[in-house]
Each structure stands twice: as C-alpha cells, then as structure tokens.
A protein has these predicted regions:
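N-proximal helix/coil linker or "cap" segments that precede and/or mark the start of modular domains
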Residues: 15-73, 90-92, 144-148
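A short beta-strand-turn-helix
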Residues: 73-95, 120
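Short active-site neighborhood of thiol/selenol oxidoreductases, capturing the structured segment around
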Residues: 85-108, 114, 127-132
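Loop/turn elements at helix/coil->beta-strand transitions in domains of secreted/extracellular proteins
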Residues: 91-95, 122-129, 153-158, 186-189
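Thiol-/selenol-based redox modules, centered on thioredoxin-like
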Residues: 183-222
C-alpha cells in the first residue's frame, strides 16, 4: 500500500484502522490479548466519534474543494481493470463521487445505500462512483479487499482508482475525513458543499439530494 495512503488512512480514522489491523492479525494474539486490543481500539474510535461530533463542519472544510472546483484530469481504471478517465463526468448529468477506505466502518456501512442511490439516479442521468484510497496505484491488496466489501454489501456501482502521485490522487489524499461525498456536474466541477458522513443517515442523504437537485437544475439550464 502506498505510504501516503497509509498515513491518510490512519490520521482520518485511527480507531477503525486499529480495529481492522487487530482483526487481520488476530491469529497472532492470545484470546486475552485480542480482547484487550479490541477494547482499546473501540475506546479510541469512541473518542474520535465524540470529537467528530463537536465540529464536523470544520473537518470537512479543512480539506474541501470549493464549489466550482474542477476534478483534476486523470487516467485510471475501475476495479475490474477497465480504463476510465475524466470523460465519465461528461457522460452523466451529475456524478456522485464517494471517497472511502476499507478500514472505515461508516464507509462500509453505507455501501448498500450508495448502491441503491446509484440505481435511483440512473433514471435522472446520474451515476455514483466510488474512490477507495487504498486502491490507488492499483494496489492489488487494496483492490481485492474493496471488492470483497462491496460484494458483501451487494454493491455493484463503479469504483475507480488512479495514481496517487497524480493531481487526482492528491485531491483524494487531501481528504481528511471519511466518508466524504461530492457531487460533480457534467463538466467535472464541484456542485455545492461536500458531504461528511454516511448517507445512511437521513439528514446526510437530504443534504446530498440538495446538491444533486442543484446539479440537475444546472444541467437542464444548458
């Protein structure tokens, strides 16, 4: 896994990262050690959730691209190896882009909701696209883990990756809170404010819908 991806993952959601790491290495610990490490990681995650609840807007603003900012040019692939680039935006009236990573519990919890949203917005000319930061640079370990999580949640919407050192990679790695979801217009420009948190929560879905409606209005006015 790319070093920058690891650093971003840990700083963004350390409790979830620890829980994931402990679970992967559970065979190396005694039952007592496993229970202790899991309990400690859960305490850290609980503290992080309390901190995040105090100032979620500040966390989003610290790494958010402003409205009208264009998504950087890129060439990459989806998780099945099919080539993809910025033309994906032009093919949609709007594109919902969700940034996530494998060890992020809130990210994984909303995967089925994102899949349902993708099915819904198809009729409006929209698409949901996922960008998992652990898959950047074509990391096979990250890709296989992401595909398993998506399959477990019954999610089949497109997920893509590109080089971490590209401008698009820097855009993704600049995000400091996960999950974060943007809406882009047909020209690849940000519409509204990014959404911090999962759309499995009603208020977050309402905020996302507001951005989608704005993108649709903009597209129909052309």
């Amino acid at each position: 896994m790319d070093k920058n991806v690891t650093e971003t993952t840990i700083s963004a959601n350390y409790g979830d990262f620890l829980l994931s790491a402990v679970e992967k290495a559970k065979d190396q610990f005694s039952d007592e050690e496993y229970k202790t490490l899991t309990a400690d990681a859960e305490k850290i995650r609980a503290i992080e959730e309390q901190i995040a609840a105090l100032a979620p807007a500040d966390a989003a603003a610290s790494s958010a691209a402003a409205q009208g900012t264009a998504f950087p040019q890129f060439e990459g692939s989806d998780l099945e190896g099919n080539p993809v680039d910025n033309s994906l935006f032009a093919g949609n009236a709007f594109t919902v882009v969700n940034f996530w990573f494998n060890g992020c519990k809130p990210c994984v919890e909303e995967l089925d909701d994102l899949n349902a949203l993708n099915e819904k917005v198809k009729a409006q000319g929209g698409e949901v696209v996922g960008i998992n930061t652990e898959t950047l640079d074509g990391s096979q370990q990250g890709i296989e883990a992401a595909k398993k999580l998506l399959a477990t949640k019954g999610a089949s919407y497109r997920n893509i990756y590109f080089a971490s050192g590209s401008e698009a990679g820097k855009f993704a790695l600049n995000i400091m809170a996960f999950p974060t979801t943007y809406v882009f217009d047909r020209d690849g420009n940000v519409v509204g404010q990014p959404l911090l948190g999962g759309i499995d929560k009603e208020e977050n879905l309402a905020a996302l819908q507001k951005n989608i409606d704005a993108a649709l209005a903009k597209d129909s006015a052309k």
